[in-house]
Amino acid sequence: ALENIGLSAAWTMTSLLLAFIWNIILLIFRKFTKLRTLLLTGHIMVQQATTVTWIVFLFIPGLRNIWGAVAVGILIGTYQAVFSNLTVEPTDRLTDGEGGFAIGHQQMFAIWLADKIAPKIGKKEDSIENIKLPGFLQMFSDNVVSTSVLMFIFFGIIMLVLGEDFMRSLDDTFSQTTAFGFYIFSKALSFTVYLNVLQAGVRMFVAELTESFKGISDKLLPGAIPAVDCAVAYGFAPANAVTVGFFCGALGQFLAIAGLLIFHSPVMIIAGFVPLFFDNASIAVYANHRGGVKAAMILPFISGIIQVLGGAVCAYVLQLVAFGGWHGNFDFSTIFLAVSYIVKYLKIPGVILCVIAMLVIPQIQYAKSDKEKYFTVGQKDDEY
């Protein structure tokens, strides 16, 4: 299968283009589809097109051609349109109507779930920003301090396990005159710096993007909402929400990995940083806004477990164990686990069934919403 997939890899970019066009078509007919978002996160579009191309080409060998690319484009374009649409209301609540964007990433279903479940776990008033730590622990209220300490512990353990010699062979910047302890400390601080730069820049990014997109959408796609990278949401949450999500998600992943070891799983998953950080930080941001610190801790922890266990099943079902595994983001350890089974056993009718099932979701959203406000939610209210 891998050789055939390699020969057909060029179809991935065709699938990506078709997915984007299909997303636009669904928006043009939004009166009927009830969809409002256009996914614009380029690297995510590439990852998703590549993954779904593998699924379809693996289980339906007869579609390793242009028709397979069309099937993949429609399938992934529908997913991108439908599940980014699910994040409109949660993001509008998070930004108090100021954002003018939705999320277009790999945990859109998780964000919707967090927004629904978090109020049942905790209280919004118990937000991370309202926590008062006693005595010297108050310094951890500053996200720079808390993130630096957490990353020092997290990266420190990993680097100590790998060993100084291995790290020197891996990193050319690790000079012979630098002590191993100082090297670990500097890397932890570097991560903190990068995170703060990311958080500081997101509002500027969102403001520029939404204004630019508005100029285009007013002419071509009136009322369309841009679905962008999940990191843009971090600027609308307490800074420590990101750190809490990362830490609790890591605990969940490590617990699940330990379970795989204890029960001698035929598939072993290694924690991947992208799902570990971006999925769980995003879940914590939305969970904290709706259910406070308790939800921001519990939901990323559960997500970490699902990422590992769902990823292990996906890697096994999709025959990827020998080829490096699975990227393990929440939606691809849940939604596309189900899609994989359906396509595996139902073939082409399975692809059609998945598309139809996803297109039903916005119809249910619309039926349960305030219909007068449905197409105005997510539109930016005011300038920053």
Feature map (PLM): residue ranges:
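Residue-level marker of positions within ordered structural domains that often coincide
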Residues: I158, K214, A287
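Hydrophobic alpha-helical bundle architecture
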Residues: I5, I28-R36, C230-A312, Y316
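Signature of multi-pass transmembrane helix bundles
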Residues: I5-E211, L220-A231, L320-Y384
